Regions:
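C-terminal recognition in membrane/secretory proteostasis and scaffolding
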Residues: 1-29, 48, 118, 132, ...
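Glycine-biased strand-turn-strand hairpin within the trypsin-fold
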Residues: 23-93, 98-115, 125-128, 134-138, ...
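Active-site substrate-binding loop(s) of clan PA
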Residues: 48-49, 108, 118-120, 137-164, ...
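Short conserved beta-strand and strand-loop elements enriched in small hydrophobics
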Residues: 60, 104-110, 157-159, 327-332
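Gly/Ser-rich catalytic serine loop of serine hydrolases
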Residues: 75, 79-83, 141-144, 191-206, ...
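Active-site loop architecture of trypsin-fold serine endopeptidases
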Residues: 77, 102-104, 138, 158-170, ...
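Conserved hydrophobic positions within beta-strands
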Residues: 83-85, 117-119, 173, 283
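Short, well-ordered loop/turn sites that connect or cap secondary structure elements
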Residues: 86-87, 99-100, 143, 149, ...
Length: 350
């Protein structure tokens, strides 16, 4: 009799433990959209995220400026892409390639309002441009600076593909830190399988809370001709987009430090016993500031401004943050000997 009473209790306890493992949000009394749909018999939906984020994603158009005012007003409007309202003050982030060459920029909000936009500044290297409109009661995209994109996160891409109207596509973050994919040499893409089509560029990649994860920018297909892969799109991480936006608002341009080194990452393996066991950048070409400082081809750059070199991307980002004209120490390995040099930071050519 006791066994008959205890057995259902034991099964219930095991089931409860399994549910807590599968749905950890139940431990603190909250539920994800997915778990709510299971327990409440509701369809799974990201409509709340769309309601939060979509109003802040705008359509961007251009219009040719004609020398005759009346004809200028009647000039055809060309769809360019999308943009994201980042501030109630009217600042909008889009891609550099979306508005490059546009004579007059028109911004259309989802509530039907239309505004002329003024360019604040652009950065070709990161493919970011900032526009400004004069308007009140603007929706702003939510930004959570403490939430980093993680592989496997569900994301929504919001934009105006092919000018058919605002469209939402869904996928996951497939990878982070992708580099070397852009014609503008930008680094650290977010890769997603959410569809990013022509016209989505400059739009928002958001998480299931409607928070901005990145600025949609391109698909892998652009460089592959007829060999078009599916499910490979890229976005500029929010942190980088915000950083560039703030610099453009403040200065109208982005000034980066530069030392004039081309090189390859140097990371010796167990089979290279005759080489030094260090991480660094094997210099293939030195020019400008590095040449003047005494850096030579085949040197291994191992330290910049008292910080060890771990990767090309990290070191170039570090140098980019240094103010041109600043003198910093660097250490190179040359024929097995450490040599300290002083280098004057230059300005990265645009």
């Amino acid at each position: 009799m006791l066994k008959k009473i205890l057995w259902p209790i034991l099964i219930g306890a095991v089931l409860a433990i399994v549910l807590l493992i599968i749905f950890p949000s139940l431990r603190n009394g909250t539920q994800s959209d997915f778990s709510r749909s299971i327990f409440n018999d509701e369809p799974m939906s990201y409509s709340n995220a769309v309601k939060i984020a979509a109003p802040a994603v705008v359509n961007i158009y251009s219009r040719s400026i004609n020398s005759v005012p009346k004809q200028s007003q009647d000039s055809p409007i060309t769809p360019l892409g999308s943009g994201v309202i980042m501030s109630e003050l009217g600042y909008i982030v889009t891609n550099y390639h979306v508005v490059d060459g546009a004579e007059q920029i028109i911004v259309a909000l989802q509530d039907g309002r239309i505004f002329a936009a003024l360019p604040v500044g652009s950065d070709k290297l990161v493919d970011i441009a900032v526009l400004k409109i004069e308007a009140s009661n603007l929706p702003r995209i939510p930004i959570n600076s403490s939430r980093d994109p993680k592989i496997g996160d569900v994301v929504l891409a919001i934009g105006n593909p092919y000018n058919i109207g605002q469209t939402i596509t869904q996928g996951i973050i497939s990878a982070t830190g992708r580099d070397g994919l852009s014609p503008y040499r930008r680094q650290n893409f977010i890769q997603t399988d959410a569809s990013i089509n022509h016209g989505n560029s400059g739009g928002a990649l958001v998480n299931t809370k409607g928070e901005l994860m990145g600025i949609n920018t391109l698909t892998f297909a652009k460089n592959l001709g007829n060999d078009v892969p599916e499910g490979i799109g890229f976005a500029i991480p929010t942190a980088l987009a915000v950083k560039i936006m703030n610099k453009l608002i403040q200065d109208g341009k982005v000034i980066r430090g530069y030392i004039g080194i081309d090189g390859l990452e140097f990371a010796p393996t167990q089979n290279t016993s005759d080489l030094p066991k260090v991480l660094g950048i094997l210099v293939t070409n030195a020019e400008g500031p590095s040449l003047q400082a005494g850096v030579q081809a085949n040197d291994i750059l191992i330290m910049v401004d008292n910080k060890p070199v771990k990767s090309i991307v990290e070191t170039m980002d570090q140098i980019a943050e240094l103010k041109p004209g600043t003198i910093v120490p660097i250490i190179v390995l040359r024929n097995g000997e450490k040599i300290q040099l002083q280098i004057t930071i230059g300005q990265l050519p645009v």
